[in-house]
Every structure is written in structure tokens, then in C-alpha cells.
Amino acid sequence: MNFETVIGLEIHAELKSKTKIFCSCSTKFGAEPNANTCPICTGVPGTLPVLNEEVVNLAIKAGTALGCTINKYNKMDRKNYFYPDLPKNYQTSQFDMPICSGGLVEFEHEGKEVKVRLNRIHIEEDAGKLVHVEGEPISLVDYNRVGVPLAEIVTEPDLRSVSEAVAFMKKLKSILEYGEISDCRMEQGSLRCDANISLRPVGQKEFGLRVELKNINSFRELQKALEKEERRQRELYTYGEGHKIVQETRRWDAAKGKTIPMRSKEEADDYRYVVEPDLPPIIIYDEQIETITKSLPEMPDEKKERFLTAYELSEKEVDILIGDKGLATFFEKVVELGATPKIASNWILGDILRILNDRKIESEDMHIEAENFAKLLKVVEEGKISNNVGREVLDEIFDENKDPMKVIEEKGLMQISSSDELEKIVAEVIANNPQSVEDFKAGKTQSAGFLMGQVMKLSKGKANPKVAKELVDKKLSEI
């Protein structure tokens, strides 16, 4: 029997606010444990929350960017459950009246247009973080993250493959980044997702029992977790053990490469939602929505059209560039400084990405500035240094943002393009390799390539290849 995979996602995006959702504590990542806390976010009795207006505006911005309906009357609710990372024993969230409803995300995947409906977007506070002490039977709790504002974006179960789910997440990340709604730093946990996956026989309308997967914080882990769970369910159905699939929550264990049962899947009733009595309803006005809509910056699809028109790049190149906001911004700055778009694109998509992957860092964290990179591309394009030397210089200047011209000058890397200088080198190579000259005269044209290699070796790679080849060919033709 053939089965169809059905996937829905619940994405938690940290909103780009400098302060928490109900207090003035900082949301900055990387502080000392429990440094960014106060009596309000840790739930000390007698304290009262005050809703951060910026959080509401960012949620409206997200809803506008994703084609949602903005609900002008919505409210906060208490979601009750007990866990060490939740100091109040409830999470302030939204239940039946979210800030945004509906929405649609469209993207191309494997040659076809995919449309994924959104169910809702609601705002809520994040929980703390458990830190497990190695070798000790205890866990510590860092409450810095408690109260950090989240937008939970819930899709309909419209995804039909693991690769579609990953492609959707990349598209959503791009929209949130370009809209300046979230920084989406997955390695810092500011963009996470839970995945609901089920299988059903092809042609069946009813959904199968869904399993929720938690602890997913990268595109690679999302793919691995979904593939493993999809395989697990498929094997159970194949061997007649489909009854063993139950509606449950499973945790993705990246180290073991498998999903592990956590608990049976909760329903809304299990959380005993109640209206938050300490916060008034949220009222949103038409003027507020209009102002926020007008403030939306250029979005990914708009930027793609502009790049294709303005820079004459291939669609594949543009897709990779705009898929990383940091790279796209860097590319535009370099071009504005005079770099040829095609050359800038080739170097960014080749060498800059290579270095980022080697260093395991994000484009936002690279130190090299567009001005210095543009200088480097200029001397390469003018033939003053070779591509290979350019790559060596890039590796050296990347981390400390050095001036490439100083590095080239200090190391004497400038390419030799003077015919007078190169003629001396070519003459020496010809004189030192009489057998290769005889071979060339005998019709072995590959000998010219060998002699050219000797010219590059003698010049320590600094000979201008084009000029050097012309001189080698000329010298051989005269013999």
C-alpha cells in the first residue's frame, strides 16, 4: 500500500523587541544565567504585567507580511502546565482569540508552486531553559528567556513531503528576516519549530494519527527528524503494526538520530486555558494596521524581481543570494561600490560562502566590510592579481577586515603584467627547457602548457596568465 505524508508545522519566532513581552528586562542573547530577570517575568506574587506595545506591532507586521487577517479585538490567556522552566506554572499566551488568523505562504519547490495555508499567529511569552549538569543528577534553570516575546505561527497540514517542509521553513525565515520581524538566529534558538507528521493511504481524505516532534532548531535537524519519523511510521504500517502509532509527542534526539517518546499528545482541555485577568483585551485600530503595512520593507519576492532585472543574474544565483538576507545586503553594498554584479555574485556564492561554512558562522557575523571586498574584486578584475591570489588575500582579510591593498603590497602579490619583465622570465624558461622546446617543434603542443607552468612557477604565481601565454606562444613561433 502506498502512503501519503502529511505535515503541519508550529513555528516559534522570537520577535525583534529589545525588551520582554510584559516587563522591561532585556531580550539580549548570551547574558549570564538569570541576569535578565525581574519579579514580573519570574512571576513573584503581587507583580503585574504590562503588555509591550512593540510586540503587538511586530505581530501585526508578521500577519501583514504573511497575508493574515488582523483581529482587531483579541486577548491574552493563561495556559496552565507544570514544568521547571515555567516559574508561574502557566504561560501567558493566546487561545481562542489570536491576534492574526489565516494567511498564506507561496514558494516554488522542485519545479512546482506550493501554497501553504496558515491557521493563525498568536503572541506568547517564552519559557526558560533547563541546563543539564553533566555527571550530576540535577538540572539548573536559566530564566533569561522567560518572557521573551514569541510569535507562534501555525500552518494547516498542507505539506506533503519532508523537503517541502524544509523549503517552507526557509521561505518563512526569509520573510521574517526581511520584514525585520525576527532575527531568526536558529543557532540561538530565536527560530524553532515543532512538526506534526502523519501518514495516510493515498486517496484517503481522513488524516492519520499525528505525532508531534519537538526539539528542532535547524533546517538539517528538521529534515532528519521528519525523515526518521516518516520511516518509523511507514515501517509500522508496512508490517501490520499501524495500531502501535499513537497520538503522542516525541522528542528528536540529534545525538542518537531518532525520535523518542515524551508523552501522549495534549489537547486544549489539558491546559485549562483561562482568560488572563491581569491584562485587558488588545484593541487594534485601522490606522495602526495601515501605518505598519506602509512600514514594511522590501520583501524577498520583490527583491528577487529587482535582482533579476537590475543585475542580470540567473534565477538560481538570485535565489541563493536573497535566501540569506545578510548576503543579499552585502552583495548590494559591494555592487554600489563599483563591483561588477556577476563577478561579485560569483565570489560571494563561491568564496564567501566557503569561508562561512568553514568557520561555521552566519553572514551577519562576518567582519569583512563591503568596501574592502569591493577593493579586492577591483584588483582581480583589473588583472593586477590572479583569482588564486585573490582567494588567498580574502582568507587573510576576512576575519579582521584588513585593507586588501596593504596585504597585497606587504606580501608583494601584485601580478606582473609588464611585457618587459615577463619577456625576461619567458626567455629564461625557454633557455632552461630545451627538450620541451624540441617537443613543441615536433608537434607536441602540450609542451607549451608545460612551459607556461614553468613561467608561473618562476614568477611565483605572479605572472599575468594572459600576457604570459601570449609571450610564450610568440617566442615558440619564432623558434
Curated annotation (Swiss-Prot):
**Which is a GO BP term held by this UniProt record?**
translation
Q: Which GO terms describe its molecular function?
A: asparaginyl-tRNA synthase (glutamine-hydrolyzing) activity; ATP binding; glutaminyl-tRNA synthase (glutamine-hydrolyzing) activity
**EC class (word):** ligase
Q: What family does this belong to? A: Belongs to the GatB/GatE family. GatB subfamily.
Which gene is this protein's source? gatB
Q: Which SUPFAM superfamilies match?
A: GatB/YqeY motif, Glutamine synthetase/guanido kinase
Q: Name the catalysed reactions.
A: L-glutamyl-tRNA(Gln) + L-glutamine + ATP + H2O = L-glutaminyl-tRNA(Gln) + L-glutamate + ADP + phosphate + H(+); L-aspartyl-tRNA(Asn) + L-glutamine + ATP + H2O = L-asparaginyl-tRNA(Asn) + L-glutamate + ADP + phosphate + 2 H(+)
Please tell me the species this chain comes from: Clostridium beijerinckii (strain ATCC 51743 / NCIMB 8052)
Q: What NCBIfam families is this protein classified in?
A: gatB, PRK05477.1-2, PRK05477.1-4
**Keyword Nucleotide-binding assigned:** yes
Q: Which Gene3D superfamilies match?
A: 1.10.10.410, GatB domain, N-terminal subdomain (1.10.150.380)
Query: What is the protein named?
Result: Aspartyl/glutamyl-tRNA(Asn/Gln) amidotransferase subunit B
Documented EC number(s): 6.3.5.-
- State the InterPro entries in the record: Asn/Gln-tRNA_amidoTrfase_suB/E, Asn/Gln-tRNA_Trfase_suB/E_cat, Asn/Gln_amidotransferase, Asn/Gln_tRNA_amidoTrase-B-like, GatB, GatB_C_1, GatB_Yqey_C_2, Gln-tRNA_amidoTrfase_suB_CS
Description of how the protein assembles with itself and partners: Heterotrimer of A, B and C subunits.
Keywords, ordered alphabetically: ATP-binding, Ligase, Nucleotide-binding, Protein biosynthesis
Report the function annotation for this chain: Allows the formation of correctly charged Asn-tRNA(Asn) or Gln-tRNA(Gln) through the transamidation of misacylated Asp-tRNA(Asn) or Glu-tRNA(Gln) in organisms which lack either or both of asparaginyl-tRNA or glutaminyl-tRNA synthetases. The reaction takes place in the presence of glutamine and ATP through an activated phospho-Asp-tRNA(Asn) or phospho-Glu-tRNA(Gln).
